[in-house]
Design a protein with these regions (language model features):
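HIT superfamily nucleotide-processing domains
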Residues: 1-151
């Protein structure tokens, strides 16, 4: 039986077994926003990576009310602006999957010349080492918080 046909998958989608809902908040919170949490990780697949995680449980964007969808998109826009200002990427990728954890969240990947996936899709499983040097991640988080608080 595939994962998507299992009772476990149904429990994840309903929120009953959602790991984010069960612990109350996602890991790696940088900042609490209007409808979401801004998260990141020292073990991110690339420098400047962030994830915007909806506070309440929903699996799909269409499950949000119009007001929630606008507010979530506004949160993502604010985060993307701050990431762009901090990292000056060639391109900023936005990804919503939910295949592993069906709780609405959007990954933001700043893309740079020479990044490990230049010109192709990102595969986080291929990254085995943190992209950050000592103190670099803490500095990124502090700068990101400052930019988000200012704007």
């Amino acid at each position: 039986m595939s994962q998507w046909n299992s009772a476990e998958w149904a429990d994840l989608c309903s929120g009953a077994a959602c790991p984010i809902c069960r612990q109350g908040k996602p890991d790696g919170i940088v900042l609490e926003l209007a409808t979401s949490y801004l998260t990141s990780s020292i073990n991110a697949p690339m420098r400047g990576y962030c994830c915007v995680v909806l506070k309440r449980h929903a699996v799909e964007l269409h499950e949000l009310s119009d007001e929630e969808a606008v507010a979530f998109t506004r949160d993502v826009q604010r985060v993307s602006r701050a990431i762009h200002e901090l990292t000056r990427p060639v391109k900023l990728n936005y990804e919503i999957h939910g295949n592993t954890i069906p709780h609405l969240h959007m990954h933001l990947y700043p893309r740079h010349r020479g990044d490990p996936f230049e010109g192709r899709a990102i595969d986080p499983k291929l990254i085995k080492v943190s992209p950050y040097q000592v103190n670099e991640f803490a500095n990124f988080v502090a700068e990101l918080r400052a930019r988000m608080s200012a704007g």
